[in-house]
């Protein structure tokens, strides 16, 4: 009889237009669940993540955001585009976290070259109408489709990091180890399901992130979709619940993109889009960030029963509309400012 192995694979997905606070949630889960591998899916260095540790902020674009947990291998899946310059700078920046010794870059990763970045920034349609980050991902993906894109195995500077991420991840799952897969950007930026044409250059849902790191759908145990109480968006495109900059400032919400430095547009929570995002990703759980911005009384609260009634009603409505439990709640930027209800499922 075939032995049944308990699945221990979790995918983290953004449920809006990116910048939902996935970095904070990933850091928290890594600290609590202690995965053996943290694997990054997604497009490439067009998405930035901010990780706050002990009052210090790290803005990263290539290395998995779970890097503070030093016991895990850090993997970049074959579906991810790699900018060697950005990657090597981050390896150096994060040397205190032993990133160099833990990093595995799949040898099949596509490579972004300078020509791709130049094309991205000079293309009037992409730069002005769509609002691209200028990181070269779109043009590089074009070359990938044409089968002329270089791969990581062709780049001398990456030789020491090369490996087979699919094998690493599947072997870890076969051993019953925890594996965390990081998605980037957000569901509503998906090339297929987002606000086309104001989208990124590939799909950004859970199924694509699984494919990016080389695992099949039956290996996935949990899909945690991350929402923030006041969604934001960088660049052009529809934003049904958008508020004015003045309204955002009155709420104390002034944010800038990690990659572009552009001011983020801010809106009110869209329950219907949240429902759709949960469906598209097959969400099993929801992580909610920025509850302290929704209600300042919730700042730093670590127990659910100490939240305000206003906050509880908001959480209950999210669960009712989406049909998915809210299990992780962030009440501040630091890792310990978190309510974890996963054991109550």
Curated annotation (Swiss-Prot):
User: What is the reaction catalyzed?
Assistant: IMP + L-aspartate + GTP = N(6)-(1,2-dicarboxyethyl)-AMP + GDP + phosphate + 2 H(+)
An example Gene Ontology CC term for this record: cytoplasm
- Keyword Transcription in annotation: no
Gene3D superfamilies, per this entry?
Adenylosuccinate Synthetase, subunit A, domain 1, Adenylosuccinate Synthetase, subunit A, domain 2, Adenylosuccinate Synthetase, subunit A, domain 3
The broad enzyme category this protein falls into is ligase
In the Enzyme Commission scheme, what number(s) does this protein have?
A: 6.3.4.4
The coiled-coil regions, if any, are none
Task: Tell me which residues bind GTP.
Answer: 18-24, 48-50, 264, 290-292, 330-332
| Protein origin, superkingdom | Archaea
Q: Where in the cell is it found?
A: Cytoplasm
Does Cytoplasm appear among the keywords?
Answer: yes
Record: residues binding IMP: 19-22, 46-49, 133, 147, 185, 200, 262
SUPFAM superfamilies this protein is in?
Answer: P-loop containing nucleoside triphosphate hydrolases
Q: In which pathway does it act?
A: Purine metabolism; AMP biosynthesis via de novo pathway; AMP from IMP: step 1/2
Give one GO molecular function term. Answer: magnesium ion binding
Q: Where does substrate bind?
A: 258-264
GO biological process entries: 'de novo' AMP biosynthetic process; IMP metabolic process
Q: Which InterPro entries does this entry report, sorted A to Z?
A: Adenylosuccin_syn_GTP-bd, Adenylosuccinate_synth_dom1, Adenylosuccinate_synth_dom2, Adenylosuccinate_synth_dom3, Adenylosuccinate_synthetase, P-loop_NTPase
Cofactor(s) listed: Mg(2+)
Annotated cofactor note = Binds 1 Mg(2+) ion per subunit.
Sites binding Mg(2+) sit at 19, 48
Q: Write the record's keywords in alphabetical order, separated by commas.
A: Cytoplasm, GTP-binding, Ligase, Magnesium, Metal-binding, Nucleotide-binding, Purine biosynthesis
Family under the similarity heading? Belongs to the adenylosuccinate synthetase family.
Q: What does this protein do?
A: Plays an important role in the de novo pathway of purine nucleotide biosynthesis. Catalyzes the first committed step in the biosynthesis of AMP from IMP.
Question: Subunit structure, briefly?
Answer: Homodimer.
Name the chain's protein.
Answer: Adenylosuccinate synthetase
Chain's gene name: purA
């Amino acid at each position: 009889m075939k032995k049944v192995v308990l699945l221990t694979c979790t995918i983290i997905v953004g449920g809006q237009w990116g910048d939902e606070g996935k970095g904070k949630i990933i850091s928290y889960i890594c600290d609590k669940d202690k995965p053996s591998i943290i694997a990054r899916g997604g497009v490439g260095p067009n998405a930035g993540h901010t990780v706050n540790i002990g009052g210090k902020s790290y803005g990263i674009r290539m290395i998995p955001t779970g890097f503070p947990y030093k016991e895990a291998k850090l993997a970049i899946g074959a579906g991810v585009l790699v900018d060697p310059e950005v990657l090597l700078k981050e390896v150096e920046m994060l040397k205190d976290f032993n990133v160099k010794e833990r990093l595995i870059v799949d040898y099949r990763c596509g490579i972004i070259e300078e020509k791709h970045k130049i094309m991205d920034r000079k293309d009037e349609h992409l730069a002005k109408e769509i609002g691209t980050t200028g990181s070269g991902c779109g043009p590089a993906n074009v070359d990938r489709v044409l089968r002329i894109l270089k791969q990581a195995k062709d780049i001398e500077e990456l030789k020491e990091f090369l490996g087979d991420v699919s094998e690493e991840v599947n072997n870890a799952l076969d051993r019953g180890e925890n594996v965390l897969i990081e998605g980037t950007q957000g569901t509503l930026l998906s090339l297929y399901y987002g606000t086309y044409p104001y989208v990124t250059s590939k799909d950004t849902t859970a199924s694509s992130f699984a494919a990016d790191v080389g695992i099949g759908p039956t290996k996935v145990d949990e899909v945690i979709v991350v929402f923030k109480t006041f969604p934001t968006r960088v660049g052009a495109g529809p934003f049904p619940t958008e508020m004015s900059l003045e309204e955002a400032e009155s709420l104390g919400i002034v944010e800038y993109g990690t990659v572009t430095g552009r001011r983020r547009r801010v809106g009110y929570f869209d329950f219907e889009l949240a429902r759709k995002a949960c469906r598209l990703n097959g969400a099993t759980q929801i992580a909610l960030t920025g509850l302290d911005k929704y209600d300042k009384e919730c700042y730093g609260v670590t127990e659910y029963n100490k939240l305000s009634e206003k906050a509880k009603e908001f959480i209950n409505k999210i669960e009712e509309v989406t049909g998915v439990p809210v299990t992780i709640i962030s009440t501040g930027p630091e890792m310990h400012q978190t309510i974890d209800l996963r054991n109550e499922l």
